[in-house]
Regions:
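Glycine-rich hexapeptide-repeat left-handed beta-helix
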Residues: 2-114
């Protein structure tokens, strides 16, 4: 719903993707979702290395760069940004910004890809 999907995006297995942008060849593992409304119903804020960006809207999911791999059962919280060529481990709960060429492990640990 209200999604921009670039070429060859894969959202194949029991996913919910709302109010989000998924880059070229991004892949959502089985059961992974983009949460697009905050639990407190406040406006969504996108966080970046440069600071916070006020969206001014209540519904905003996630932005995934090109060739991002999202593991099974992952929740991408409202306003999450995942840089190109990054991997998200299964069963993660992602908040905020994940740099390009990174691996997001459980509990928010982010390491650079080799």
């Amino acid at each position: 719903k209200n999604v921009v999907l670039f070429n060859t995006v894969q959202v194949p297995h029991y996913n919910y993707v709302g109010d989000s942008v998924l880059g070229y060849k991004a892949h959502m593992g089985a059961g992974s979702i983009t949460s697009n409304v905050k639990s407190d119903k406040k406006l969504v804020v996108v966080k970046s290395p440069e600071g916070q960006i006020e969206t001014g809207i209540k519904k905003f999911g996630a932005m995934l760069g090109d060739e991002v791999e999202v593991g099974c059962g992952t929740v991408l919280n409202p306003g999450s940004v995942v840089g190109s060529h990054s991997n998200i481990y299964p069963l993660s709960s992602v908040r905020g910004f994940v740099p390009a060429n990174s691996i997001y492990k459980k509990q928010g640990e982010v390491v650079e890809k080799y």
